[in-house]
Amino acid sequence: MSDPVIKRALVSVSDKSGVVEFCRELSSMGVEIFSTGGTLRKLQESGVAAASISTITGFPEIMDGRVKTLHPKIHGGLLAVRDNADHIAQARDNGIGFIDMVVVNLYPFQETVAKPDVTFEEAIENIDIGGPSMLRSAAKNHESVTVITESADYRTVLDEMRENNGATTRSTRLKLAGKVFTLTSRYDRAIADYLAASSEGEASSEAGSISVRLEKEIDMRYGENPHQNAGFYRMDDGSGSRSFEEYFRKLHGKDLSYNNMLDTAAATALIEEFRDEAPAVVIIKHTNPCGVAQADTLVEAYRKAFSTDTQSPFGGIIACNRPLDMETAKAIDEIFTEILIAPAYEEGVLDMLMKKKNRRLLLQRKPLLQEVTEYKSTRFGMLVQERDSRIASRDDLKVVTKRQPSAQELDDLMFAWKICKHVKSNTIVYVKNRQTVGVGAGQMSRVDSAKIARSKAAEAGLDLNGSAVASDAFFPFADGLLAAAEAGAMAVIQPGGSVRDDEVIAAADEHDLAMVFTSMRHFKH
């Protein structure tokens, strides 16, 4: 069958960008246009010849527009196989005219339910019924019908029609049909996820089934190691789309590697803990913080963070919670860093930093989503959990020792607790005056983590006397706490919950330590 000439088009869109110009060109090629509701009004007000869909159906739009295109004269006109004699005869006998083009995009359901104040009733009213039905009918019969779901395809279709005497090519129709089923499957999944969450009142990590769509956003040279293939995919699990370009803009440097992406995720997750607080700087290496600090100025925060470990930051990732100023940029420029991340860059800073071509500069466009579902693939299935977004407040703390923490110790305890959540377990973090002074990460023994943190502090020439220490999980024995006391710590924050808590508390009292329990663990694997 030859490519069918487009003579009649049905146009009904929620996104009206470019639709007037598109329909005006269709009309100039002799295409008869039918439309509904707001689209019809916009076309007519713009001087584009268009008729109501009711002229086809002989039936008015009813029930606040819920029923307008669900009619045999619409779907018969879309689904009729044009070289099937029986279909043609049945269409003729029932007064059904063929429809050669459908231009439809759907009610903005995902955007509606993403609004924090949306009501259930508003969400339901934004479930499109007629739109998906017309799209699917048109896509199924793509041998005869051209179907368009987004304005980005208007120009391609118009150009083809002009080149082919009013027809589109089969390859284009097939491609556009594929877009339909991608769109409707995502749309239906979003609705299903929303209704499931509304009826169950549960996080999606507790749902019986989860649909996740991954679409490649970035090609990567290789994965964690050069012999591994890799890519970065934007993700939509029904709770909202997540993509690199949505949150970041690369201003300078080479493409990010697989490991760069992991470190960027770690750096931004940690700096988010200090979003609305005093100037803060985070230095990350292999997804672990090797230095974190707050101060009255950004440059002071950077110098304090760097002094925690003056070797590991080379080739690391630095993130800050303030626009990057020239003084701080010059201090950072003294060493090689893979990536700098900032919410803004002050005048002249980019020009100076861009002199090093291998350094990547990222602009963080907006805060990261807080309540998201996390996925971790194994070779035998997928783990799903809520993100560890909770952080203990001062009101959550329970002092379990004879000595109460001082105001300064309490500040440092809260600072250390925020950081230990982002360090690989087992975790011990020493803090003094809003600065990490020792970080022990990823050891099988909590005592070993405490020893490593103390050793790193000694290498950096930092004094642990009077410091506060955080442990991501309880001390199973008193030995871990005693190691911290021996290092000079005077205040401890930990979840508590060990069967030997009494022994640990007694050891703290014996060394005049102030200790608080959070009743919240922060394992990170």
UniProtKB/Swiss-Prot annotation:
Reactions this protein catalyses: (6R)-10-formyltetrahydrofolate + 5-amino-1-(5-phospho-beta-D-ribosyl)imidazole-4-carboxamide = 5-formamido-1-(5-phospho-D-ribosyl)imidazole-4-carboxamide + (6S)-5,6,7,8-tetrahydrofolate; IMP + H2O = 5-formamido-1-(5-phospho-D-ribosyl)imidazole-4-carboxamide
Entry keyword set: Hydrolase, Multifunctional enzyme, Purine biosynthesis, Transferase
Stored CDD domains: IMPCH
Domain MGS-like: 1-149
PANTHER family: BIFUNCTIONAL PURINE BIOSYNTHESIS PROTEIN ATIC, BIFUNCTIONAL PURINE BIOSYNTHESIS PROTEIN PURH
Protein family (similarity comment): Belongs to the PurH family.
Name the UniProt record assigns to this protein: Bifunctional purine biosynthesis protein PurH
Species, as recorded: Chlorobium phaeobacteroides (strain BS1)
Lineage of the species this protein comes from: Bacteria, Pseudomonadati, Chlorobiota, Chlorobiia, Chlorobiales
